[in-house]
């Protein structure tokens, strides 16, 4: 078993508390000053690893309000993928992609000793920076910028002065699921990772021109890493793991039209991801960080339940200056919408004054999910079964040295079933993370009773007609990567064509937007898209609604019908001004026999739409 270095750091409290100070998070009106004093103590038998700058586990001892606290930290080993890349562009538009070393990084998660409900997200790159939750209260720690000093400030979130009184909103406007049964009380839905299947979101972040003007700034990278690390810590109770596989910087110009209209920008970003980014880098989800100030005080926006869909698996998040935790909460909020979670209503509760899915960002943002969010998430996984996030990264995709006992099967390990006390795998020796004598395997869909299954055995069944089954190779315990049916294959009794593993048809889009009673409106309703009016158009250019060509009317605005006896207008389906981003026909949707909608809102021949030499759709 690999030995790790245990570090103890004592934080001696300075003999005074400050009344007001300007820190990275803003003007803080009450804080404590502490001095981290690093004490290295190698456990018996441990070996120092000189090539590793940042230890895998660390422990900090300090005082908060005069009481001793022990903070245990463990490196976030799934923060980066092995093929993590960064992309910049030359002024002439040429792309340059590099793979910077990220294995020995300095981002940690943790807990407070003897506090079962505690948590922490810390950067140890230059001093200690981040936050921890102690006895239900959020504290922040960051280095004080004093010469020749190890001084740090510790303060509560409530002591950061508010920037303004204007409510900050999320741009997603849908409300609640049509519930089949009552939502459980919060006491019945205490969120722990053991309740949920582990999922991995392989994320690409795009930094737009407004935020990436200083493209060579190390501070921008640090900001992104801290935000993603904090968002991961928020998702831990739901067993959701966000792995950063790439960052792209739009240094000289934006590659889409980023405007003050959040919904227009979201549409443009989704189209760009489907037609450009997906052809260059395999990933599950893309997120745009921007400094653009959107209309209606919108902080973020996404497509509800869009995860794993080419056009809809995207979010936009407005960065909040140096308040990285606030940005992380917004990021987690929008990703949660993409995972099927709605805004909290008046009956939604968590053990905090507000919850992650509140439609308005609180002065003191919460890290807790409500009973409603847990219900929404469980229901989403059951109904939608998003394929891409159930593919864990391959062992070689997890960076940093392996740690035996963390239940992550990493490069160099034959198995990892957790600690000896908790291991329930009969094939694995928990103390060494090696297979027991006679065992051929200990993990994987192609492993049964410690033996590798024979070649040709189905290890992952096709989920639907736009998926294909995977088979064991007979050489490995791992099931091959999930493959999808060829784009353009007819599906759902010829009502649609497969597109990146989905069968997008208008009926399902109407149901997703308006509930199970909704249906597609009559063909005559789509003639409204010829007008270029408020409710009928094909696309927008510089804020102007462009009418559809006659052959493209079914690729513009989506018209749905509510099959209710009280509904007298067959073309009447209300979209508010904030709903426009979700009222368009999805790319890949069948518009005529043998034709589908492309990203330009054109109804084109299905064979032309899916011609590709790279294996990616050119729709």
From Swiss-Prot:
GO CC, one annotated term: plasma membrane
Domain Disintegrin: 401-487
DNA damage in keyword set: no
Cystine residue pairs: 215-251, 308-388, 348-372, 350-355, 404-433, 415-428, 417-423, 427-450, 441-447, 446-472, 459-479, 466-498, 491-503, 510-560, 525-571, 538-548, 555-597, 591-603
Gene Ontology biological process terms, A to Z: proteolysis
EC identifiers of the protein: 3.4.24.58
InterPro entries recorded: ADAM_Cys-rich, Disintegrin_CS, Disintegrin_dom, Disintegrin_dom_sf, MetalloPept_cat_dom_sf, Peptidase_M12B, Peptidase_M12B_N, Reprolysin_adamalysin
Named cofactor requirement(s): Zn(2+)
Post-translational modification as stated in the protein's UniProt record: N-glycosylated; probably required for conformation. Removal of easily accessible sugars does not change its functional capacity, but removal of the core sugars with N-glycanase causes a virtually complete loss of enzyme activity, apparently as a result of major conformational changes in the molecule. Not O-glycosylated.
Propeptide residue range(s): 21-188
Annotated binding of Ca(2+) 2, by residue: 467-468, 470, 482-483
Short sequence motif D/ECD-tripeptide: positions: 465-467
Residues given in the record as Ca(2+) 1 binding sites: 403, 406, 408, 410, 413, 416
Catalytic activity: Specifically activates several components of the blood clotting system, including coagulation factor X, coagulation factor IX and protein C by cleavage of Arg-|-Xaa bonds. Has no action on insulin B chain
Domain Peptidase M12B: 199-393
Classification via Gene3D superfamilies: Collagenase (Catalytic Domain), Disintegrin domain
Residues at which Zn(2+) binds: 333, 337, 343
Record's cofactor remark: Binds 1 zinc ion per subunit.
Glycosylation sites: 216, 257, 351, 371
Main location: secreted
Domain of life: Eukaryota
Entry's Gene Ontology molecular function annotations: metal ion binding; metalloendopeptidase activity; toxin activity
Entry's family note: Belongs to the venom metalloproteinase (M12B) family. P-III subfamily. P-IIId sub-subfamily.
Task performed by this protein: Catalytic subunit of blood coagulation factor X-activating enzyme. Activates coagulation factor X (F10) by cleaving the Arg-Ile bond and is also able to activate coagulation factor IX (F9) and protein S (PROS1) by specific cleavage of Arg-Ile and Arg-Val bonds.
Subunit description: Heterotrimer; disulfide-linked. The heterotrimer consists of 1 heavy chain and 2 light chains (lectins): LC1 and LC2.
Descriptive protein name: Coagulation factor X-activating enzyme heavy chain
Organism listed in the record: Daboia siamensis (Eastern Russel's viper)
């Amino acid at each position: 078993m690999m030995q790790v270095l245990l570090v103890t750091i004592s934080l001696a409290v300075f003999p005074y508390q400050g009344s007001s100070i300007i820190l990275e998070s803003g003007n803080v009106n009450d804080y404590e000053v502490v001095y981290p004093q690093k004490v290295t103590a190698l456990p018996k038998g441990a070996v120092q690893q000189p090539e590793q700058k940042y230890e895998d586990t660390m422990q900090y001892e300090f005082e908060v309000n005069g009481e001793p606290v022990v903070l245990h930290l463990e490196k976030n080993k799934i923060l980066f993928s092995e093929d993590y890349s960064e992309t910049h562009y030359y002024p002439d538009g040429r792309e340059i992609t590099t793979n910077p070393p990220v294995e020995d990084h300095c981002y940690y998660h943790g807990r407070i000793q003897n506090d079962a409900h505690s948590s922490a997200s810390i950067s140890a790159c230059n001093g200690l920076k981040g936050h921890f939750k102690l006895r239900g209260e959020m504290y922040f720690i960051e280095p004080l910028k004093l010469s020749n000093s190890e001084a740090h400030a510790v303060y509560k979130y409530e002591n950061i002065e508010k920037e303004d009184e204007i409510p900050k909103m999320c741009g997603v406007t849908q409300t609640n699921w049509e519930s089949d049964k009552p939502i459980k009380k919060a006491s019945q839905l205490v969120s722990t990772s053991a309740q949920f299947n582990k999922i991995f979101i392989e994320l690409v972040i795009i930094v737009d021109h407004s935020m990436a003007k200083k493209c060579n700034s190390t501070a921008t990278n640090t900001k992104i890493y801290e935000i993603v690390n904090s968002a991961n810590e928020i998702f831990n109770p739901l067993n959701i793991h966000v792995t950063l596989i790439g960052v792209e910087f739009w240094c000289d110009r934006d590659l889409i039209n980023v405007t003050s209209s959040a919904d227009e920008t979201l549409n443009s970003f989704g189209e760009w991801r489907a037609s450009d980014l997906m052809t260059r880098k395999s990933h599950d989800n893309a997120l745009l960080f921007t400094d653009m100030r959107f209309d209606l005080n919108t902080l973020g926006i996404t497509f509800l339940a869009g995860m794993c869909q080419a056009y809809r698996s995207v979010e936009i998040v407005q960065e909040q200056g140096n308040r990285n935790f606030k940005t992380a909460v917004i990021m987690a909020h929008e990703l949660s919408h993409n995972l099927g979670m709605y805004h909290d209503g008046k009956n939604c509760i968590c053990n905090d004054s507000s919850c992650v899915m509140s439609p308005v960002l609180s002065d003191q943002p919460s890290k807790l999910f409500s009973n409603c969010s847990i219900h929404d998430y469980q229901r989403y996984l059951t109904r939608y079964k998003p394929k891409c996030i159930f593919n864990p990264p391959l062992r070689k995709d997890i960076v940093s040295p392996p740690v035996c006992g963390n239940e992550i099967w990493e490069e160099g390990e034959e198995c990892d079933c957790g600690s000896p006390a908790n291991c329930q795998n009969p094939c694995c020796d928990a103390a060494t993370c090696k297979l027991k004598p006679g065992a051929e395997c200990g993990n994987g869909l192609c492993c049964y009773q410690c033996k590798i299954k024979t070649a040709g055995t189905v290890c992952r069944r096709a989920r639907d007609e736009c998926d294909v089954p995977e088979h064991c190779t007979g050489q490995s315990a791992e099931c091959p990567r999930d493959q999808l049916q060829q784009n353009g294959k007819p599906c759902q009794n010829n009502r649609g064509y497969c597109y990146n593993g989905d069968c997008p048809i208008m009926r399902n889009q109407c149901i997703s937007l308006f509930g199970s009673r909704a249906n597609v409106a009559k063909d005559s309703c789509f003639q409204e898209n010829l007008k270029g009016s408020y409710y009928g158009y094909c696309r927008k250019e510089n804020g102007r609604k462009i009418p559809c060509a006659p052959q493209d009317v079914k690729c513009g605005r989506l018209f749905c019908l509510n099959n209710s006896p009280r509904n007298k207008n067959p073309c009447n389906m209300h979209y508010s001004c904030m709903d426009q981003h979700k009222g368009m026909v999805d790319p890949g949707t069948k518009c005529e026999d043998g034709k589908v909608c492309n990203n330009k809102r054109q109804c084109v021949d299905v064979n032309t739409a899916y011609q590709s030499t790279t294996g990616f759709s050119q729709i």
